[in-house]
């Protein structure tokens, strides 16, 4: 006989009913697993309560500084990476970089100057650093900044 999905059953003891406490002496009644006396036996204590010691949220320092809400995040591509992805040179824009898997689509792109490039490329990006511009133009390429 072949085993089918509707024949499968949980292993014995794998599924146990939830124990209902405080429902009579014979089944975890009376103290219901809370022990005797004290705050924890009588009522809830806050989840962050540490028994009177200084709580972790008061021991740790407050965050310093601030976060600029208007910061622009760029997907970065180095000149060396462009040389790897486009060994024949040609036009390098956002669409080509997305197709090559270097950046994600619908994101701002910044070209950085790490690495070497020996082929002429026509780079179009939102931002290009000074060193990247120098290397690309020295190799015979052109740079167009969109931003």
Swiss-Prot record:
The record's listing under PROSITE patterns reads:
RIBOSOMAL_L15
Task: Give any single GO term for biological process.
Answer: translation
A GO cellular component term found in this entry reads: cytosolic large ribosomal subunit
Domain of life, source organism: Bacteria
Give the residue ranges for region: Disordered.
1-42
Q: InterPro entries per the record?
A: Ribosomal_uL15 (IPR030878), Ribosomal_uL15/eL18 (IPR021131), Ribosomal_uL15/eL18_sf (IPR036227), Ribosomal_uL15_bac-type (IPR005749), Ribosomal_uL15_CS (IPR001196)
Q: Name one GO molecular function term.
A: rRNA binding
Compositionally biased residues, Basic and acidic residues: 15-28
The UniProt family comment states:
Belongs to the universal ribosomal protein uL15 family.
The free-text function statement in the UniProt record for this protein reads:
Binds to the 23S rRNA.
Q: What is this protein called?
A: Large ribosomal subunit protein uL15
> From which source organism is this entry?
Nocardia farcinica (strain IFM 10152)
Gene from which the chain derives: rplO
């Amino acid at each position: 006989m072949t085993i089918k999905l509707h024949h499968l059953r949980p292993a014995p003891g794998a599924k146990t009913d939830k124990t209902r406490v405080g429902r009579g002496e014979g089944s975890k009644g009376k103290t219901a697993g809370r022990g005797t006396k004290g705050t924890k036996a009588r009522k809830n204590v806050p989840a962050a309560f540490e028994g009177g010691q200084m709580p972790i949220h008061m021991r740790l320092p407050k965050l310093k500084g601030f976060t600029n809400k208007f910061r622009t995040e760029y997907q970065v591509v180095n000149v060396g990476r462009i040389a790897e992805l486009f060994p024949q040179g040609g036009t390098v824009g956002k669409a080509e970089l997305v197709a090559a898997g270097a950046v994600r689509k619908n994101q701002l792109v910044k070209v950085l100057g790490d690495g070497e490039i020996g082929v002429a490329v026509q780079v179009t990006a939102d931002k290009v650093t000074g060193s990247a511009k120098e290397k690309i133009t020295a190799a015979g390429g052109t740079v167009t900044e969109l931003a």
